[in-house]
Regions:
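Structural and coupling elements of P-loop NTPases
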Residues: 1-530
Length: 530
């Protein structure tokens, strides 16, 4: 086997998704702990002196205890090279999450054992299902009072339309949660230890061993466990082809907080999840193991390091081998380039790398030439990877700098944050950038925008929410745009590409405007590839 094939086969690149507060970021930390990447896990919520989670690198994330931007973390464990893409769980940042899922070969779906399938779980699952990537389910918080495990499996199948296969089974729940039964190895794993910051000790016992009743403090509990396991055995078998197609989800139970069940989950997951998958381009499917390098940009982030004040473009390598200082071709820019400072990341920590392989994510310095969705290839191999989803904003805010002397910083900040895809900026026709209209999917994005403008660019903002919630592109106008008959429930805007749009206070206002302007044709901005 060639070195190229061997290296690519070692890669495991996956995203972790969940509804807010299901424990996604804590699980990410425990992957790093058991993978040997960190000596002690941070805790997202807890004592004030607990350090913040490794994956939450932005200052506002550390303060609020939530993830508002995707993090990329690479580490080596058990012969695998692991690339974790941690995503925001909050629905206001779903656009960043959707883009990140485009770079993943598999997904870990974290579910709260007490709450089951929640709204954001459904939305993110749909994106994974559209891509037909393997989806592994981790039922978290078994250390708390949870719903019946069989009911949870039924709900996943009913709500998400995917078959399930329990890879392990919980031994008790809440204060009685002591471990899991590993079905593949036919063993009971009892865990102990009170702090979730360190590895949990475990003891292996046979399911039918007489000491199990003693460990469970009840012969009745032992018999119930045996009955559950035997009931599972009468069900469907694990079909890896169905897993790879995204039709069957292996399910694991555990507690990210106490670490119970985390180590066997990570070990099994790395064996089951696929090596980097082939990608579709406009010329057909690109072979992952082709020696020719190719990649696409799925994320842009400014000011990850305050000392540098730079901007990184995150590239998912789709084929071949990347080498530092080699010559590559930027398809959208139509030019050759050398990427001399490629970096691999552990959240905000960076390290210059000489080479990387298909499946890896690298960050490259971006002087403003890259956009989300761009394709990079070797010279002579020109094609475009499928686009990245973009979303129509649902909330709009008029924004300007409180201090007019800060105009330059205001323009730079809004443009850079918009290029990251965190916000969309519009302006009134024939106006400058002194005042802009910011559009976002969720209002929490406005809080983050305001926080970053102050902290990263030194600009205090004047912000006025606007009564608009719908936006449409003008496809055809019956008259000059400034002569359109618009009421108080509509306003004409331009985007950064100079395209003309209308924003409306309601869906009914759209219909009213079209009827008042015969010949006006509007296009809906939907989740689209761009």
């Amino acid at each position: 086997m060639s070195d190229l094939v061997q290296e690519i086969n070692r890669r495991r690149t996956f995203a972790i998704i969940s509804h807010p507060d299901a424990g996604k970021t804590t699980l990410t930390e425990k992957f790093l702990l058991y993978g040997g990447a960190i000596a002690q896990a941070g805790v997202v919520k807890g004592k004030k002196n607990s350090r913040s989670a490794t994956s939450d690198w932005m200052e506002i994330e550390k303060q609020r205890g939530i993830s508002v931007t995707s993090s990329v973390m690479q580490f080596q464990s058990g012969g695998f090279c692991i690339n974790i893409l941690d995503t925001p769980g909050h629905q206001d940042f779903s656009e960043d999450t959707y883009r990140t899922l485009m770079a993943a070969d598999a997904a870990v779906m974290v579910i709260d054992g007490a709450k089951g399938v929640e709204p954001q779980t459904r939305k993110l699952f749909k994106v994974c299902a559209m891509r037909h990537i393997p989806i592994f389910t981790f039922v978290n918080k078994m250390d708390r009072e949870t719903r019946d495990p069989f009911d949870l499996l039924d709900e996943v199948e009913r709500e998400l339309g995917i078959e399930t296969y329990a890879m392990n089974w919980p031994i008790g729940s809440g204060k009685d949660f002591q471990g899991v039964y590993d079905r593949a190895e036919s063993r009971l794993l009892f865990f102990s230890g009170v702090s979730g910051k360190n590895r949990a000790d475990k003891m292996e016992v046979d399911l039918y061993d007489s000491q199990v009743a003693t460990l469970l403090d009840s012969e009745e509990k032992h018999q119930k466990l045996i009955e559950d396991v035997e009931l599972l055995s009468a069900g469907r078998e694990l079909d890896m082809e169905e897993v790879r197609c995204g039709n069957l989800s292996p399910v694991f139970f555990g507690s990210a907080l106490t670490n119970f069940g985390i180590e066997p989950f990570l070990e099994a997951f790395l064996k089951l999840t696929p090596a980097p998958l082939a990608r579709v381009a406009d010329c057909g499917t690109i072979d992952t193991f082709s020696p020719d390098f190719s990649a696409f940009v799925f994320k842009i982030q400014a000011n990850m390091n305050k000392a540098h004040r730079d901007r990184l473009a995150f590239m998912r390598i789709c084929s071949g081998k990347f080498q530092r200082d080699a010559e590559y071709y930027h398809m959208q820019g139509g030019r050759k380039m050398r990427l001399s400072q490629p970096q691999q990341l552990m959240a905000a920590e960076r390290e210059i790398v000489e080479e990387a392989y298909a499946g890896d994510v690298i960050g490259v310095f971006d002087p403003g030439i890259f956009s989300i969705g761009d394709t990079i290839t070797v010279p002579g191999k020109k094609f475009l990877y499928s686009g990245i989803p973009t979303f129509a904003p649902e909330h709009f805010c008029r924004v300007s700098a409180k201090d007019s002397m800060k105009r330059k910083q205001f323009v730079k900040g809004t443009e850079q944050i918009a290029q990251e895809g965190a916000i969309q900026i519009f302006k009134l026709p024939n106006s400058g950038m002194e005042e802009v209209i910011v559009g976002v999917v969720g209002t929490l994005q406005l809080d983050v925008f305001q926080y970053r403008m102050k902290g990263e660019y030194g600009v205090d903002l004047r912000m006025e929410m606007l009564p608009y919630e719908e936006i449409r592109m003008i496809a055809k106008s019956p008259c000059p745009l400034d002569e359109l008959n618009l009421g108080s429930d509509a306003e004409l805007l331009e985007d950064y590409k100079g395209r003309n749009l209308l924003v409306f206070s309601s869906y009914w206002a759209i219909d009213f405007t079209v009827r008042r302007n015969p010949g006006l044709e509007l296009q809906e901005i939907v989740v689209a590839e761009g």
